Amino acid sequence: MPTINQLVRKPRKSKVSKSKSPALNFGYNSMKKKATNNAAPQKRGVATRVGTMTPKKPNSALRKYARVRLSNLYEVTAYIPGIGHNLQEHSVVLIRGGRVKDLPGVRYHIIRGALDTAGVDGRMTSRSKYGTKAPKK
């Protein structure tokens, strides 16, 4: 337990919290070729690789992912939610933060129904999360 004199000389430091989606915290100025300090809720990028990976124990599946080069020149791995997708190399995608618990290193989600990513076909529930239009009556 510090004395009051010690606290006067050197106050307590507040904890610095680390971002869970660091690639969204920076922009890029292509004229100056420098990173800028403007954060964004989503970022646009180009898929450089699309594939599947297996989750950690005890789960078993083939989870779809895309490696994305963002507009700020960061390269990140993003999860493709929903059943089926139309993404391939050079597709333009929009990503948001949000990790996938059983895929190590996947901290971002691709937003379905935005840019080149199509919504999930035949989806009836939670349609807004998967970019699906309302069914015809």
From Swiss-Prot:
Disulphide bond pairs: none
Classification via CDD domains: Ribosomal_S12
Keyword annotations of the record: Methylation, Ribonucleoprotein, Ribosomal protein, RNA-binding, rRNA-binding, tRNA-binding
Keyword RNA-binding: yes
Superkingdom in the source lineage: Bacteria
GO biological process, one term: translation
Modified positions (3-methylthioaspartic acid) in chain numbering: 102
Purpose: With S4 and S5 plays an important role in translational accuracy.
Family the entry assigns: Belongs to the universal ribosomal protein uS12 family.
Subunit text: Part of the 30S ribosomal subunit. Contacts proteins S8 and S17. May interact with IF1 in the 30S initiation complex.
Protein name in UniProt: Small ribosomal subunit protein uS12
This protein's encoding gene: rpsL
